[in-house]
C-alpha cells in the first residue's frame, strides 16, 4: 500500500517445487504487510485488496486459501491490540471474541464478575476491582478431533489496559498500556483460525480479561 497499489497480478513459477512456497509467501506478505488500523483517521489510505496469481495449480490454490485464512485472523488479532483501551474493555473484548468464534462453531463460555468471585478466581477479581469496567473470564473450546484426542490448552494474558495500578507507569510506557491483552488476542485468534480450517484437533483457550486501572470515582 506504500506504493499506492490496490491490486497486483503475479505469474507463478512453472517449476512445481516452487509453486506452493511462492504463493504462500506472496499471500502472507501481501496480507500482513497491507494491514492498516484506520479507525480513527480522517484520511484513510487506500487498501491493498486483491492479489491475482497466474498459472497456479490446485495445490497452490489450496495453500493460498489456507494462508489467507490464517492471515485474516492474524490481522484480526492486530486490530484488537490496536484498538484503544477506552473502547476495548474486558466486556467488549469478550463480546467481540464470542461473536467471531461462534460463527465458526466454537463453544464460548463467558464468566462475569459474579461468577469469577463464585469460582474463586481471586487474582483476576482483585486486579479488576479497581476499574470501573469489571473483568471477564473467557473459555473457548474447539472440538475438531475425536473425543479420545488429547486437548491443546492455550492461555493468554488479557489485561486490556494496564496503567500499572497504584504504581503508575512512566511516560515511556504509556503508549503500550493497551497492549497487555496481546496474548489473549493471539490465543483466541489461533483457535478461530484452527476452526476456520477445520483442523482435526481439540483446543481450549482460557483468558482472564481485566483492566489494571484505578477508577477515579
Walk through the language-model features, giving the residues of each.
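Flexible glycine/proline-rich, aromatic-decorated loop/lid segments
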Residues: 213-217
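Alpha-helical metal-binding/catalytic segments enriched in His/Glu/Asp
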Residues: 97, 152-154, 163, 167-211
Amino acid at each position: 500500500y506504500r506504493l499506492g497499489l490496490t491490486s497486483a497480478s503475479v505469474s507463478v513459477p512453472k517449476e512445481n517445487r516452487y509453486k506452493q512456497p511462492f504463493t504462500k509467501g506472496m499471500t502472507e506478505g501481501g496480507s500482513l504487510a497491507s494491514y492498516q488500523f484506520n479507525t480513527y483517521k480522517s484520511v484513510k489510505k487506500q487498501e491493498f485488496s486483491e492479489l491475482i496469481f497466474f498459472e497456479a495449480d490446485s495445490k497452490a490454490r489450496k495453500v493460498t486459501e489456507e494462508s489467507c485464512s490464517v492471515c485474516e485472523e492474524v490481522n484480526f488479532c492486530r486490530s484488537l491490540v490496536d484498538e484503544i483501551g477506552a473502547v476495548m474493555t474486558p466486556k467488549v473484548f469478550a463480546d467481540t471474541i464470542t461473536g467471531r468464534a461462534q460463527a465458526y462453531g466454537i463453544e464460548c463460555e463467558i464468566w462475569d464478575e459474579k461468577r469469577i468471585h463464585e469460582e474463586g478466581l481471586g487474582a483476576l477479581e482483585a486486579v479488576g476491582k479497581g476499574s470501573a469496567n469489571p473483568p471477564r473470564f473467557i473459555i473457548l473450546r474447539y472440538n475438531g478431533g475425536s473425543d479420545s484426542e488429547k486437548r491443546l490448552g492455550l492461555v493468554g494474558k488479557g489485561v486490556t489496559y494496564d496503567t500499572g495500578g497504584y504504581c503508575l507507569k512512566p511516560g515511556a510506557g504509556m503508549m503500550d498500556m493497551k497492549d497487555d491483552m496481546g496474548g489473549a488476542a493471539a490465543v483466541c485468534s489461533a483457535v478461530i483460525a484452527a476452526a476456520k480450517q477445520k483442523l482435526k484437533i481439540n483446543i481450549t483457550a482460557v483468558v482472564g480479561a481485566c483492566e489494571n486501572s484505578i477508577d477515579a470515582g
